[in-house]
Amino acid sequence: MNKIEKALMHALFVHLHHNIDKAIDFSIFKKLNQKVGQTWPAALLVGPDANDDAAVFNMPGSDCLVVAKMESHCSPCVPRPYDSAATGAGGAMRDVVAMGARPIFLLDFIGTRPMEQEVIVGPCGFDGKCTCGKCQVMTSQDRINLMLKGIADMCETMEVFVVGGGFSTSFSDIVPAVVVSVIGKQVTDQPLTKPAKSAGDKIIIIGETGTDGNDTLYRAGLVDTMQPAIALFKEERMAMDATLAAFATNKIKACSDLGAAGIGAAVCETARFGGLGAKVDLAAVPVRVADITPEEILICETQARMLLQVEPADVDEVLALIRSKNDVAAAVIGEITNDDQIVFEYNGEKIAVIPNHPSPEEIQQLGN
C-alpha cells in the first residue's frame, strides 16, 4: 500500500465510512424509515441509510418527489467562517442535484458562544491564541455574521431561498455548530442514485480540479501546506446548470457530487456501492492550475464539481449539452469495469489501486 492509497483508503474507510464509526447508531435511521413508511406507505423512495447523497420522498397525495439533505460544516468554520459556511451550503445543494433534483429551499442552524465573547478566526482558531500572526480577533457576533453571509451569498448565487433557521448562543465549545438543510424538487423521471449501474459506462466529470481542499493529503504528509477548500460561487452555479442540462437528455445512469477526498472518494463509492470496479485516467481531468500533481487531482476537495455516468453511445450528446452552458469544463475521465477494484492512472502509470473490500489487515494499516 503506497502513501496515496493509504491516504485515500483512510478517507474512504475511516473518515467517510460512518458504518465503522461506533458513535453512530444506525438502528435509529432504520426506525425512522419504518415510522415514515407506516405513516406514508411507499413514500420514502431513498432513505437516509441508503449510502446515497440525499433522501428522496414522494409527497403524499401528489406526484411530486422531494429531495432533502442535511449537512454540517462545523470545524472548517473556525479558521474560515465565510468560505466554510458557503461551501457547506454549496455541498448540500450539490448532494440534492446529484439525486436528479433542483435545489429550492434552505434552512440553517448556527450554535455558538455568547455574542460578546471573543473568538480567534484563522489558523490558530482551535488553540484559542494566535501564534502565527495571521489570525483575526473578533466577537462571536462578527463570526456569526460572516457565516450567515457565506450561506446567504451561496443561496443568492444558486437562486435558493433561505426560508428559516435556528440559532443558539448556549454553545461553549470553540467550534460552532453550522448545519444546513436543503430541499429540492426532482426534475428527472426517477431519482438518480450513486451506485454504478453497468460495466462499460463512461465516467464524465463536470468542473475543474484545483489544489485547494487538500486536507486528506496534508494529514498524510503528501503536501507541505494545507489549503482549505475555496467557495466558488460562479462556478458552483455553472456546474449546477450544466448538470441539470445533462439530466434533460434522460441519458444519465448515475450521478454523485465531489466532496471530501474528491474524485478518489466519489469514484470508489459509486463503484463499490454498485458492486463493480472502475478505471480512471487522472491526466484527462480538467484542472485549474498547471503544476497540479496526480495525487492532488485524485484527492483534492475542489468545489463545484459533479460526476456522471452514461453509456458510451450517449457521451457526445451529454458533453455537448454540458458545454453549451457557459462553456463549462467537462471530460470523460474513465469507465466502470466488471471488477472489484478501482484503478487510478496518470499517463499510463498506476497511481493508486483501491479494493472494494479491504482485508482486516489493510484496514488495520490505516491507523498506523
Short names for language-model regions:
Residues 28, 32, 67-71, 78-81, ...:
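Short acidic, glycine/serine/threonine-rich loops at helix termini
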Residues 143-201, 289-368:
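Phosphate/diphosphate-binding loops
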Residues 65-76, 107, 111, 115-118, ...:
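Gly-rich Lys/Arg/Thr-decorated short loops/hinges at beta-loop-alpha junctions or inter-strand turns
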Residues 109-122, 130-139, 143-146, 153:
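Acidic low-complexity segments
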Residues 70-74, 109-117, 125, 166-172, ...:
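Acidic, glycine-rich active-site loops and adjacent beta-strand->loop/helix elements
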Residues 1-32, 134, 196, 202-241, ...:
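Intein/HINT protein-splicing elements and their conserved insertion hotspots or analogous self-processing inserts
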